[in-house]
Amino acid sequence: MDNVSIVDFLKRRGRDKSKINIFPSASLTKNLEGKNMTEFGLLQNKGIIGFTDGIKTIQNPRLMSRIMKSAYDLDSLIMQHAEDSELAENGTVNDGIIATKLGLQGISELAEKIIIERDLSLLEDFNCRYHISQISSARSIDVIDKRKNEINFTTGVSINNLSLNENDVGDFKTFLKLSPPLRTEDDRIELVKAINKNLIDVIVS
């Protein structure tokens, strides 16, 4: 959602037709293109509780710095899917043994780590409400562990990455080609440990 009329419609529809409360998020950029910011102030005044481009990452650091500044000024929550598009290269599984075995393009854990490091560095200057939507690797946890007491941010993890690993992809199980991808068993174990260490704040499905 990137305009006020859609937010109005959704909230009216929820109020009139649903028995549950709807707390919508809007997109960070118009049409999820990662180029131009949406109208944070107008959307937030209509009841938006946060901003995210879903599984699309804000790749441009200049744009992310502008987003963080606006989020700080308006006390908005921004949620980032951490994946460098150049390193991910349209991969579908973890860059490892399974990718090689199946002849698939892999996604390096560096694609996640680099975006997290960049955003947390920007966060030092802007100090807005920032959430890393889903982490998947031990290397990302190392970064988070080092920065958690220095700056204010939250992190999430998918139940898939907590309960499955890259071996579960098996022989081309397309429904397990996820974003972020399932990583190694060592990564999965470190994610579970990170929950016990309070390094992860949210579990999503």
How should each PLM-predicted stretch be described?
Residues 35-203:
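Histidine/acidic residue-rich metal-binding segments in metalloenzymes
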Residues 27-33:
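Active-site beta->alpha loop and helix N-cap motifs at the rims of alpha/beta catalytic domains
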Residues 26-27, 53:
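Short glycine-centered, acidic/aromatic-flanked micro-motifs in structured strand/loop junctions
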Residues 1-17, 26:
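Metal-associated gating/positioning segment near the N- to mid-region
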